[in-house]
Amino acid sequence: MSPKRLLCAAALCLSFAAAGALAQTAAPTAEPAAEPADMPGMESSAPEAPEPPAAPAAMPATPAAVPTPAAPKATAAKAPAAPMTGPVRNVVLVHGAFVDGSSWNGVVAKLQQKGYHVSSVQNPLTSLADDVAATRRVLARQDGPTILVGHSWGGVVITEAGANAPNVAGLVYVAAIAPDLHESTMDLMKRAAPAPAGQAITADSTGFLWLDRSKYHADFAADVPENLTRVLSAAQQPISARAFSETVSQVAWREKPSWYIVTTRDRAISPEVEQFMANRMGAKIVPISSSHLVPVSHAGAVADVIDRAARELSRQQ
């Protein structure tokens, strides 16, 4: 057989095979296709079968009706868990940026002397979500009603973490950022001229912010002994720069009684901004003549505010 005839036969064979496959796909109930005849030039012991009559054209399949999507079922909104009752004897403390949980040491000691069960959260400061998760882990370990306290950036954390938390009886903001719904730290800081401490913050190559050690005392902790501020600045924890632009999706102070300590000599958060936030949330305001690091410089006064808040909440239970 000539090469030309062989190529034509091969093409014809492939066309049959493709048509057979297409028929099987389009009409699964059709009879299996007959075995292909021997290619021309190939020996066969069986007599050549007569060519079958052409099959009638298949009727086009009726397209399946597209099911009408079921109407969504109305679901009742999940009711918030009932708040716990009883005396408030648990305190959870949430630190801010450029410090760690040890910044609460003096407050912890004072509250323990008053008989409270105190826990100090160690925030990773990697994002708002991470800090909220760390705080909620500590809250989950509390047995009974709890007062949640945040300093500085910790105010953003307790605003989110304290919402819909049945064991959180109330909130204390200590020179803290208190955002409203979908509001960020940066949104609030823009309400006043840049604070001196803001000019001392620098970013590293990984996107974390640090407070200049040489300005830590003057701009962050002016009423803390210098030897202690050197230790604090050496142990400072940086915060992710993106955290200051993250917004809250829940607002605890809208559903919980709140207190606010305004630090009148603050060089990190403007006292005017603190006063604005405290007034907006309807908090009970306690001014203290202090630098931003009031949990260190006035640990006793801060502990007294927390104690008074806990006692008042206990009377309301």
What are these regions (language model features)?
Residues 83-128, 167:
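Conserved HGGG/HGGXW glycine-rich cap/lid loop of the alpha/beta-hydrolase fold
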Residues 231-252:
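Active-site nucleophile elbow and catalytic-triad environment of alpha/beta-hydrolase enzymes
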Residues 264-296, 308-309:
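Conserved loop-alpha-helix segment in the C-terminal half of the alpha/beta-hydrolase fold
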Residues 149-154, 158:
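Gly/Ala-rich beta-loop-alpha elbow adjacent to hydrolase catalytic centers
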Residues 23-86, 315-317:
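Compositionally biased, proline/threonine/alanine/serine-rich low-complexity intrinsically disordered stretches
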